[in-house]
Amino acid sequence: MKIKALSKLKPEEGIWMTEVDKPVLGHNDLLIKIKKTAICGTDVHIYNWDEWSQKTIPVPMVVGHEYVGEVVGIGQEVRGFEIGDRVSGEGHITCGHCRNCRGGRTHLCRNTIGVGVNRTGCFSEYLVIPAFNAFKIPANISDDLASIFDPFGNAVHTALSFDLVGEDVLITGAGPIGIMAAAVAKHVGARHVVITDVNEYRLDLARKMGVTRAVNVAEQKLDDVMVELGMTEGFDVGLEMSGNPSAFNSMLKTMNHGGRIALLGIPPSDMGIDWNQVIFKGLVIKGIYGREMFETWYKMASLIQSGLDLTPIITHHFKVDDFQQGFDIMRSGMSGKVILDWE
């Protein structure tokens, strides 16, 4: 049986609608009928066919890794799922036999394979993944929100790396993940949550999500904002979401002594750092990759169920046949999360 899918067919700019074989269910797998998918920044990198994509992405391949769907097939060894379960899933498929996997730290698996990056993705009518990777979506969480659990998980993992209660938090980079991290920080009890960027559209989105201050660093100095907020000692926690060297160096300068930084944004490999700031301030820097399995996922569901409102971050919906419009708007930078409807 042939099914509709969005694939990287050629080693050049673009993503194409195509027909592929329906995936085959293995003994330990679930077959998921896709309802909604969201376009990730990674998918835009793959579309643009940048240097990272050229080194990483096999062609041809179905792409995508943010989704919600319904279980329509269950492998014979699988327990704990039923036909009709609504699920999203962890996009990092782990080996199960390295030291970290065996120690329960699966998010640190050294042999991780990415759905829609190293193997067939979710931008298709059906997806097969190991049942271990699936996460049941509670009934009181919408399909829209469930479809962005993957990037929301990046935000939650990054934001909850350190205690935020009563702390002043700086977030550099107001992409969707940065904005969601800011909303999480506010929700769990941070005092001042300041987010920086140069994209006014996205800073506006951050304001709708309740940040203390959204600062356009092309127009306003971070130091001035700190004075206005009555901050005398610097930020306690930094969440670096941009991969921008000047943003990171600005963060180092404005951190308080003993401050803690979580790094999710991917900088250029040759980024220079003022290590004096790190050493003499006694800063702690933690790298973040993916989501903790599955602690982050349970936290995501709980945060939404306890009143965290992420709906403003979803700015555009398109039918899957209009996927090109979705990619165009994502590439323009004038969007939050863009959802493609497969039903």
Curated annotation (Swiss-Prot):
Zn(2+) 1 binds at C40, H65, E66. It catalyses: L-threonine + NAD(+) = (2S)-2-amino-3-oxobutanoate + NADH + H(+). Keywords: Cytoplasm, Metal-binding, NAD, Oxidoreductase, Zinc. It is an enzyme of class 1 (oxidoreductase). One of its GO terms (molecular function) is L-threonine 3-dehydrogenase activity. NAD(+) binds at I177, D197, R202, L264, G265, I266, I288, Y289. It is found in: Cytoplasm. Its cofactor is Zn(2+). The active site is at T42, H45. Its EC number is 1.1.1.103. One of its GO terms (cellular component) is cytoplasm. InterPro entries: ADH-like_C, ADH-like_N, ADH_Zn_CS, GroES-like_sf, L-Threonine_3-DHase, NAD(P)-bd_dom_sf, PKS_ER, Zn_alcohol_dh. GO terms for biological process: L-threonine catabolic process to glycine. The record marks D150 as: Important for catalytic activity for the proton relay mechanism but does not participate directly in the coordination of zinc atom. Binds 2 Zn(2+) ions per subunit. Zn(2+) 2 binds at C95, C98, C101, C109. Pathway: Amino-acid degradation; L-threonine degradation via oxydo-reductase pathway; glycine from L-threonine: step 1/2. Its main location: cytoplasm. Homotetramer. Belongs to the zinc-containing alcohol dehydrogenase family. HAMAP family: Thr_dehydrog. Catalyzes the NAD(+)-dependent oxidation of L-threonine to 2-amino-3-ketobutyrate. This is L-threonine 3-dehydrogenase.
